[in-house]
Amino acid sequence: IGYEKVFSMLKNGGAFARFANHPYRDKENVELSQEIDKIYDLDYNKYYNKERETISGYTEQQAKEIAMIASKYGFSDIRYELFYRERVFSANEYIELLGTYSNHIAIEESIRTEFFAKIKEAINNHGGIIKIHDTIDLQLARKG
């Protein structure tokens, strides 16, 4: 529906730009990542009755495939660009970030509180910081 709405709103020659952020958790600190994965299994995945998802970095091939979706809705001159950044969080800052994610907010409060406390403890036990490697995907397309 989104592509159709954007296409109908644009004049001929109008441009559509879409940004998406794809965070990848601390690939240098494997032990911390493994501990956080276990915490997710015990709390988050159990709450949502999900299996652990394999976490990997966002690739150029994925960016290309997603950008090309616009062609199905009549867009042309389709391009994409990837940008990279690293964010460093203290344990408290990272918990504050997680607290902004709708799928984390939706967890029943007592479970969420314990879940966040475990993640905070894991980060503090592994140096007190966590790095997030973002791949920012810019997709551009034109009507007409």
Language model segments and positions:
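Conserved catalytic/acceptor-binding region of the Class I
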Residues: 7, 11-84
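Short, conserved SAM-binding segment of the class I
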Residues: 2-6
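Conserved Class I S-adenosyl-L-methionine
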Residues: 57-144
